[in-house]
């Protein structure tokens, strides 16, 4: 049944998704589950060929980065794959979970050895890179019902898969990040929601220190220092990575505003108010749920993770704290794509199933914001209260939609680590980084 009031959700999502003209990352943890559609190990998947058959059974190899311990992976293995196999006799899905960064690198390696899977769930920022490598199938050119299938998905979400007039994937989900904060700790300290960067800094300073058990407490957590993590702070404070045409980093990545934003994070780390990205640090969900981290920027999946691991933990949310440029989060999301070595008939059947209203409603229960129009208008989405994230999408920005983004992101992460963790000079490091990024943009 559909609620008439949920039309508002679809309207908001459609409006918000107009921001999705570029790209969108999501994540959790890892440990395989055993199900009727049993997840194979990476070693086994190496031996599985893209168009493998066993008698009359065709195997569809699907690589993804739903963490193996996550609700998303449980739904994939226990609900979606069994349903697909039931509806499509003769097909078996061999699903393999990878860490987010490992999946990207695995695809690069497999492309050179011609051992790519049939289908993969891709961070939208990877699509231009893989298209440039000529390993993705142009779906609108090769699938006769592409127009019908894609019409069921938000047009602006589909734009993340469009390159030079052709479509190389189907939109699968969208997301962004908002601020989660420890409501009880904030109330006890007389603090209100951290709606500005000044609020965030003041709260981090006041709440960091040692708790009643003698344990260290930090005001702000980020699990990494990649673009996905640091860009909201840079953008909200008026900084940039490149010019608006994505051709130049000098004078943007090393501008005064970007330098000041990065220095803010470095100072917080130096003052023991910011952590989470070093080896051995408390994992994000555990640190937040046990009161060791007071604030973090995260996506809609964090709601279900906290409900499962720390159901009694009291937290609240607000938009990314606004700086001089406003509140600007980072767009996230994934597309589902077919590789040119695939068993195309089976791969396309699976892709259509994964973007169906049924599959997207099931994934919405796990914190994935659908891009299927029917799923967006469902009771599942209405009851999940995605409104704060859909609101944030309207002002969020995409990571630069360039084929060299993965290399740029690696260089950015290295520079942020050098500055924040190791105390390198901010201006000098960003000057050098801007020069490197200029060269990568020119490739």
Which residues are covered by each model-predicted region?
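Extracytoplasmic/periplasmic substrate-recognition and gating elements
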Residues: 82, 86-87, 92, 188-189, ...
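Long, aromatic- and glycine/proline-rich binding clefts that accommodate carbohydrate-like moieties
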Residues: 156, 311, 315-318, 364-414, ...
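Short, solvent-exposed loop/beta-turn-alpha elements that line the ligand-binding surface or hinge
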Residues: 140-153, 210-213, 218-220, 239-260, ...
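Hinge/lid segment of periplasmic solute-binding proteins
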Residues: 99, 124-177, 201, 229-233, ...
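Extracytoplasmic/periplasmic solute-binding protein
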Residues: 163-172, 177, 199-250, 293
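C-terminal motif of bacterial Sec signal peptides marking the signal peptidase cleavage site
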Residues: 21-25
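Conserved N-terminal structural module of periplasmic/extracytoplasmic solute-binding proteins
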Residues: 8-12, 27-135, 144-147, 193, ...
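Glycine-centered hinge/linker elements that transmit conformational signals in sensory
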Residues: 204-206, 247-277
């Amino acid at each position: 049944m559909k609620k008439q009031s949920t039309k508002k959700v679809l309207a908001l999502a459609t409006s918000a998704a107009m921001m999705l003209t570029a790209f969108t990352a999501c994540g959790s943890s890892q440990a395989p589950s055993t199900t009727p559609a049993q997840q194979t190990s990476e070693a086994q998947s190496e031996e599985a060929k893209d168009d493998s058959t066993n008698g009359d059974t065709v195997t569809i190899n699907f690589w993804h980065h739903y963490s193996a311990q996550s609700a998303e992976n449980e739904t994939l293995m226990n609900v979606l794959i069994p349903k697909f196999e039931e509806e499509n006799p003769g097909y078996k899905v061999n699903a393999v979970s990878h860490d987010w960064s490992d999946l990207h690198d695995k695809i690069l390696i497999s492309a050179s050895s011609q051992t790519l899977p049939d289908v993969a769930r891709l961070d939208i920022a990877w699509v231009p890179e893989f298209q440039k490598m000529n390993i993705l199938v142009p779906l609108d050119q090769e699938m006769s019902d592409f127009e019908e299938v894609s019409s069921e998905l938000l047009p602006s979400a589909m734009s993340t898969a469009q390159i030079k007039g052709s479509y190389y994937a189907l939109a699968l989900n969208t997301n962004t990040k908002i601020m989660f904060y420890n409501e009880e700790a904030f109330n006890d300290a007389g603090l209100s929601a951290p709606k500005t960067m000044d609020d965030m800094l003041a709260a981090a300073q006041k709440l960091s220190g040692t708790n009643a058990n003698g344990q260290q407490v930090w005001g702000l957590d980020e699990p990494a220092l990649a673009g996905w993590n640091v860009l909201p702070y840079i953008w909200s404070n008026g900084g940039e990575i490149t010019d608006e045409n994505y051709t130049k980093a000098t004078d943007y990545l090393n501008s005064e505003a970007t330098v000041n934003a990065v220095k803010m994070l470095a100072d917080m780390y130096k003052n023991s108010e910011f952590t989470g990205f070093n080896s051995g640090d408390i994992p994000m969900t555990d640190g937040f749920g046990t009161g060791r981290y007071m604030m973090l920027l995260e996506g809609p999946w964090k709601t279900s993770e906290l409900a499962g691991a720390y159901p009694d933990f009291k937290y609240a949310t607000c938009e990314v704290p606004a700086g001089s440029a406003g509140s600007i989060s980072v767009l996230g999301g994934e597309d589902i794509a077919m590789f040119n070595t695939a068993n195309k008939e089976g791969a396309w059947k699976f892709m259509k199933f994964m973007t169906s209203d049924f599959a997207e409603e099931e994934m919405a229960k796990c914190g994935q914001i659908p891009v299927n129009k029917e799923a967006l208008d469902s009771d599942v989405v209405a009851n999940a209260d995605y409104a704060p994230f859909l609101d944030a999408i309207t002002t969020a920005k995409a990571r630069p939609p360039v084929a060299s983004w993965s290399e740029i992101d690696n260089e950015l992460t290295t520079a942020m680590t050098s500055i924040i963790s190791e105390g390198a000079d901010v201006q000098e490091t960003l000057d050098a980084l801007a020069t490197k990024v200029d060269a990568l943009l020119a490739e």
